[in-house]
Amino acid sequence: MFTGCGLFACVRRCDGGDVRKRGEAGAMSSRVAADPAGVEEEGSCKNVAAASARQLAWADVESVTGGFSSRVIGHGGFSTVYLASLSSSRLGAVKVHCSSERLHRAFRQELEVLLSLRHPHIVRLLGYCDERDEGVLVFEYAPNGDLHERLHCSEVAGGVASVLPWARRVAIAFQVAMALEYLHESRHPAVIHGDIKASNVLLDANMNAKLCDFGFAHVGFSATVGCRPSARAVMGSPGYVDPHLIRSGVATKKSDVYSFGVLLLELVTGKEAVCRDTGRRLTAAVGPMLSEGKVADVVDRRLGGEHDGAEAAVMAELAMQCIGDSPGLRPSMADVVRALQEKTSALASAVGSRLDRKMMF
């Protein structure tokens, strides 16, 4: 997910053609039904921030991108990202994604999931457009990028190193845990995120976590590889994927728990899920040391000792439980939330921590 500028809008292409050459005659797809409480009268995209998951016209999407002629600010393997002006003072990013008919169905499934979610630590869907083959999603602003950037690319303006403080790491772990607990325990049927990783955790103006990217989410107790448009949809991301999922081809809530365990290890160690130089997985690199109780040996050295040793031990122990080989022995996300809340004093002083549990709606 691109988070570099303001609101993020994701446009998924289905035919690989030049989006600028498509006129109003583009194929009309059947629209996804939205929650009545979240639908407002269609209008300009300039006011999208005031709405709740508004259904937008394709003309609005073209307007904010200048007919897709605005400055290109990013490229991906299958996408181009355009700078968009949502208002006189608000910028956004429109991602044009080359896809297929099958992936368009996946987009519609993602939209249906997003329309049903409301939690303070899940990125909020502000608007969408499903008029044509292209699908557009507009999300809330996340000015501080994503957790991967903050944890592993820690430079701020002027080139001064900026290490994510320990208390903030604990708060982020707790907030992501609450978001997953909400998906697993408060939604009926449960929602399996399917791709928990540091780059899918956005950080708002107060550095609070917002779980994002539900493109591979599954609704229900479990999902198999065969029922998704691609193996990537179930297999997650390198370094985070549950080995049991690889063996069985079945994603469950405990698959998310495993990925969250890897995220905990990242927060404790400051190291990436997969080493860029060696390709070694973080779980393999630090797992043996943690099994021997050598927590102090793996804590991020950039913290300079400014962390709570007892809290680090709690985080490490939880991480090891989450990445256990047997899914049945892994804790639930409710168990993780409870343990973090009871055993980490950093939560008491971190912004938006304990009170956030009362904000679920």
From Swiss-Prot:
Coiled coil: none annotated. Residues 67-347 form the Protein kinase domain. The keyword Transmembrane helix does not apply. Its main location: membrane. Palmitoylated. Palmotylation at Cys-5, Cys-10 and Cys-14 by DHHC9 is required for plasma membrane targeting and STRK1 function. Autophosphorylated. Pfam families: Pkinase. Keywords: ATP-binding, Cell membrane, Kinase, Lipoprotein, Membrane, Nucleotide-binding, Palmitate, Phosphoprotein, Serine/threonine-protein kinase, Stress response, Transferase, Tyrosine-protein kinase. Disruption phenotype: Increased sensitivity to salt (NaCl) stress with increased oxidative attack on membrane lipids and higher intracellular Na(+)/K(+) ratio associated with reduced phosphorylation of CATC. It comes from the Eukaryota. A lipid is attached at residues 5, 10, 14 (S-palmitoyl cysteine). Self-interacts. Interacts with CATA, CATB and CATC at the plasma membrane. This is Salt tolerance receptor-like cytoplasmic kinase 1. The lineage of its organism: Eukaryota, Viridiplantae, Streptophyta, Embryophyta, Tracheophyta.
